[in-house]
């Protein structure tokens, strides 16, 4: 698990709502099926991925298993249930590779370049999976968010970046 149960408590405090939480690995197809069966899910906001570029270079298989296998399970379950399926996918600007200065600023239509890390490759592959599945399954709708460096937190500071160990980006150092 690369999140904190404390975050769930904080979201409940902020919203005043009780949230249902399942602690599971979405690579576990049976557990994922159970969650969808027990709930009337018609939309998913998918943020479940490892995101440390350096770690992905050192441990690429960890990233492929977590970021891609879990994503495939989720999308397959969404499209085979026969209901309307909507997904918001958290991608990354790393899909653009390392553009040359004359290719800046980056625009959304800019083609992908060679992935600069296994993390970036997982995002490129996942976007490709979504693109193909949206074409093949009329019940699937997808929105992809390509962050450059997501920053910020709730004004209460109860939710936001909570890195384990040394942070991988600037914001935790300055907040």
Regions found by a protein language model. Give the residues of each.
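N-terminal Rossmann-like NAD(P)+-binding domain of SDR-like oxidoreductases, especially those catalyzing
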Residues: 1-155
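Substrate-positioning beta->alpha
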Residues: 121, 144, 159-175
């Amino acid at each position: 698990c690369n999140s904190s149960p404390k975050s769930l408590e904080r979201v409940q405090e902020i919203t005043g709502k009780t949230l249902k939480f399942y602690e599971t690995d979405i690579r576990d197809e049976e557990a994922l099926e159970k969650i969808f069966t027990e709930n009337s899910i018609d939309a998913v906001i998918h943020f479940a991925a490892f995101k440390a570029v350096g770690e992905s270079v050192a441990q690429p298989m960890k990233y492929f298993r977590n970021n891609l296998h879990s994503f495939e399970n989720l999308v397959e379950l969404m499209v085979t249930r026969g209901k309307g399926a909507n997904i918001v996918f958290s991608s990354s600007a790393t899909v653009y590779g390392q553009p040359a200065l004359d290719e800046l600023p980056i625009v959304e239509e800019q083609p992908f370049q060679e992935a600069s890390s296994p993390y970036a490759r997982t995002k490129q592959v996942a976007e490709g999976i979504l693109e193909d599945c949206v074409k093949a399954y009329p019940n699937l709708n997808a929105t992809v968010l390509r962050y450059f460096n997501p920053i910020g937190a709730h004004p209460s500071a109860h939710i936001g970046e909570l890195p384990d160990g040394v942070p991988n980006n600037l914001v935790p150092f300055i907040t």
